[in-house]
Each structure stands twice: as C-alpha cells, then as structure tokens.
Curated annotation (Swiss-Prot):
Region forming the signal peptide: none
Keyword DNA repair applies: yes
Chain positions covered by the region annotation Domain I: 1-63
Location in the cell: Cytoplasm
Protein name stated in the entry: Holliday junction branch migration complex subunit RuvA
Region described as Domain II: 64-142
Keyword terms, alphabetized: Cytoplasm, DNA damage, DNA recombination, DNA repair, DNA-binding
Organism: Streptococcus pyogenes serotype M5 (strain Manfredo)
Encoding gene (name): ruvA
A single GO BP: DNA recombination
Length: 198
C-alpha cells in the first residue's frame, strides 16, 4: 500500500494525472485533474489510495489527507465504488456532504452520480456521526489567466463525463456556459455546484 507519492507532475488528462518518481510515471485517478494545472512540471505530493483488481491496479490521488479520508469513508459504504466516491469528492463541499449524512438528507445525496435512494440511505446508516469534524473544502482553485473558452469547456465536460455524470445533464451545462471564458478547473467547480442544485 502507498500513503503518498512525491514527484514531478508531467501530464494532465480528463480522468487522471501522471506523476513521475524515480523514473516511473504513475497514472493517478483524481477528482478534478485540472485543479493540478498550476503544478505541471513541478514537484508535487499526492496522497494515495490503491485499489487492486484482477484486471488492474489503480491509484487514486488527493490534494490533502482530509480529502483522502472522505474518500475512504465513502468507499466503505456498500454500493459506492472508487469512481462514485471521486465524483462526490470533486464537488468539494464536505460540509454539505456531512450535514446531508448527519441529517438524513436523502434528496441531496441522490444528486451525486450513481447514488440512488438505497445507496443514499446506506450512506446515512454507515456514515452518520463518523465525521467528527467536517474537513474544510480543499480550496485548491486559484485565479489564472483565461485560456480559450471552448477548449477549456470541452475539457471540463470530458472530466465530468469521466466522473459519471450523464451526457443529457451536461448538455444543459454546456449551454449554460457557452460564450464564457474560464479555465477547465473553474468550469468543473461551477458545473458541479449547478448539478448539485438540480
């Protein structure tokens, strides 16, 4: 098992980042790959969780140990896999998540991709009271100069699809942001807020 990796961030895609350490490039699945844009070609520390399957060994990465802790609690719930847990972490609203779990707000929990009523109820059963203190949002969004709007929006939509959101939902998101000029990371964060509002 790995706790963290320290190395050079060499690549960002819609689904994962690549960190090079000791001559090896590690593919690491992350909640919002574009939140790492400012760190390309720089030394980074990524907190890790490894999932071993028959057909693959997967690494999931996080900005902070708090983010990793939320992820680990989520995948302990029956019906929630790593991809769904990443989609929940990507919303970056841990306080809202904890409040929803502790107050049995099933409707809020069902707004996450692939979370139906039964899984939402299971989240409440398994996790209520488990978050002693709601971790703060990671706050890793930084203001940057805007790049070409459409390309950035395309990348954001691709990343949201990778998190499990439906194309029909994202068609409305694309229409909402058409004509604006933001970074992919900013589009993702804004889109996730809109998706959670329903």
């Amino acid at each position: 098992m790995y706790d963290y990796i320290k190395g050079q961030l060499t690549k960002i895609t819609a689904k994962y980042i690549v960190v090079e350490a000791n001559g090896l490039g590690y593919m690491i699945n992350v909640a919002n790959p574009y939140s790492f844009t400012d760190s390309v070609n720089q030394l980074v520390t990524i907190y890790l969780h490894q999932v071993i399957r028959e057909d693959a060994h997967l690494l999931f990465g996080f900005h902070t140990e708090d983010e990793k802790d939320v992820f680990l609690k989520l995948i302990s719930v029956s019906g929630i896999g790593p991809t769904t847990a990443l989609a929940i972490v990507a919303v970056d609203d841990n306080e809202g998540l904890v409040n929803a779990i502790d107050n049995s707000d099933i409707k809020y929990l069902m707004k996450f991709p692939k979370i139906g009523k039964k899984t939402a109820q299971q989240m409440v059963l398994d996790l209520a009271g488990k978050f002693v203190e709601a971790p703060q949002e990671t706050g890793h969004t930084k203001a940057r100069s805007n790049k070409a709007g459409n390309t950035q929006l395309d990348e954001a939509i691709e990343a949201l699809l990778a998190l499990g959101y439906k194309a029909t939902e994202l068609k409305k998101i694309r229409a909402f942001f058409e004509g604006t000029s933001e970074t992919a990371e900013q589009y993702i964060k804004s889109a996730l807020k809109l998706l959670m509002k329903g």
